[in-house]
Structure formats: structure tokens, C-alpha cells
């Protein structure tokens, strides 16, 4: 299934399923870091791989994510300085390491986890129609949730999606002043949102560019720059911009309408997926 020259000889998983949740800090001056955003760790493309998962929250989705890194299915092993500079020069200049491979990996982790959930929810395992209905339902809500998480994280920093994509001096100043991260926030919550929002188009891109295995990123510079072109083409599309504004409006109305603890469940969580199975 996976044709890769850097498959590990062994892969060991350590699961410490703590009850610690990923949540926004109470103090808006706190820079988002692994405490709020991360649930696992690994080193990609190692001969003897090790994966550590340290939260129960989203644990299986995180297993998929970290396994992608370990099996070298993304492009974390490539030299990314040029593509990062090109991204900041031609698309959005933010104070971020970018790590675009994290967005690619999180997209596929979300998609494959959704497939797993849909299969689990389908009572008759050979009922393809029911499975596809569940999958369509799940992916629809993951798209909505990704939009919500994107605008919520930006709002926490005092930014909107338009502040990110516009090239006027005010927007540039706001980005330079307000956008800060100590982990892959931009990759997890912003770029991943774009990929999930345009998942059909991105799946076609993967099918065209990745060869025989659709999720195994073809590790060439041409593929890297093609990936960047995909992002450039979709980041500023009207449909995405309009839906981020609708999500922001819903976020603000939700805060006003509901009180603790219900309000905090949705407005504070830093989960990256909303659908799960016990």
C-alpha cells in the first residue's frame, strides 16, 4: 500500500491517555504553545520510530497524524526554506515557522479519522450507501468546525481572516503586531482549514501529484511548488472568506447568547476535530 524508501524497521507507540484538554488560555497575552495545541510527538522518517501520545482527547486522530510523520508520508524530510520564503513573500507573511507539512498531515489525519468514524457508525459494514452518508455528514461538520476554530484562534490574537489575506498597511501592521505562536498554530488551524474547506479540489490535487498512493506526498520540488500554488489559488476565494465571516458572526453571537459552562465547551476548546467515537 505504501511505497516508500524510508519506511521504519520498527514503530513503537506509547499512549499516556491523560485527561488534560487542549483549551485557549484565560490570558490573551499568552502565546499559544504545545500546552494548548499538541497531543503527541514523534521524529519523522526514522529507522526505528517512536510515537508518544499524551492526551486521551482526539487520541486516535493524533495516532494517525504522528504515524504519517513516522512513515514519511508528508514532506518533513525535505528542505523547506525556499518554499517557506516564497509563501511569506507571495501569500501571507506571518510570524510562523509555517511547517506546511503539518497542514498536509493534519488534513489527511482528519480525513482518515472521519472514514474510521463513518465506518464505526455504520451498523451494516457492507452497506456502502449508509457509510457514504455518514462520511459526508462527518466531513461537513469537520469543515464547519475547522472554520470555527480558524476564526476563533485568530480572534484570540485580535485578528480576522481578512487581516491575514489583505495586503494593505493596516492589515500588515496587525499581523506583525498580533500574530504570535510557539507551535504550529498557523499550520494546524489556518492552512488546514483551507484544505478541509476545499477538500474535493485538494483530493484531486493529491491524486494528480502523488502518484500511486494518493496520500504519500511526492517528494520533489515541483510537488512542493504545486502545493504552494494550490494554497495561493484557494486562500483568497470569495466562498472561504464569506464563510469565515459567517463563522466569526456565529462565534460572537454564541458568546453573547450562552453562559458558562456550555459557552466554554465550544469557545475554549482547541480540538482540531469535532466528531469522535468512544
Predicted feature locations:
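Post-HExxH zinc-binding segment in Zn-dependent metallohydrolases
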Residues: 76-144
Amino acid at each position: 500500500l505504501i511505497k516508500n524508501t524510508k519506511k521504519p524497521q520498527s514503530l513503537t507507540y506509547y499512549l499516556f491517555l491523560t485527561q488534560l484538554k487542549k483549551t485557549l488560555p484565560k490570558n490573551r497575552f499568552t502565546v499559544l504553545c504545545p500546552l494548548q495545541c499538541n497531543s503527541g510527538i514523534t521524529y519523522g522518517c526514522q529507522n526505528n520510530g517512536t510515537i508518544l501520545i499524551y492526551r486521551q482527547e482526539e487520541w486516535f486522530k493524533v495516532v494517525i497524524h504522528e504515524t504519517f510523520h513516522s512513515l514519511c508520508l508528508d514532506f518533513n524530510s525535505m528542505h523547506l526554506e525556499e518554499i517557506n520564503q516564497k509563501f511569506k513573500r507571495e501569500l501571507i507573511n506571518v510570524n510562523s515557522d509555517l511547517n506546511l507539512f503539518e497542514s498536509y498531515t493534519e488534513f489527511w489525519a482528519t480525513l482518515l479519522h472521519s472514514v474510521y468514524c463513518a465506518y464505526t457508525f455504520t451498523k451494516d459494514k457492507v452497506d456502502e450507501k449508509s457509510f457514504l452518508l455518514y462520511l459526508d455528514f462527518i466531513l461537513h461538520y469537520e469543515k464547519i468546525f475547522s472554520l470555527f476554530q480558524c476564526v476563533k484562534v485568530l480572534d484570540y490574537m485580535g485578528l480576522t481572516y481578512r487581516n491575514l489575506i489583505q495586503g494593505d498597511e493596516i492589515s500588515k501592521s496587525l499581523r506583525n503586531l498580533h500574530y504570535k505562536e510557539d507551535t504550529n498554530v498557523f499550520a494546524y488551524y489556518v492552512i488546514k482549514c483551507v484544505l478541509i474547506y476545499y477538500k474535493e479540489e485538494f483530493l484531486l490535487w493529491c491524486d494528480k501529484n502523488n502518484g500511486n498512493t494518493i496520500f504519500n506526498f511526492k517528494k520533489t520540488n515541483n510537488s512542493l511548488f504545486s502545493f504552494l500554488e494550490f494554497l495561493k489559488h484557494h486562500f483568497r476565494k470569495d466562498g472561504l472568506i464569506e464563510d469565515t465571516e459567517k463563522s466569526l458572526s456565529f462565534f460572537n453571537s454564541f458568546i453573547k447568547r450562552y453562559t458558562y459552562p456550555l459557552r466554554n465547551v465550544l469557545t475554549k476548546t482547541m480540538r482540531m476535530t469535532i466528531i469522535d467515537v468512544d
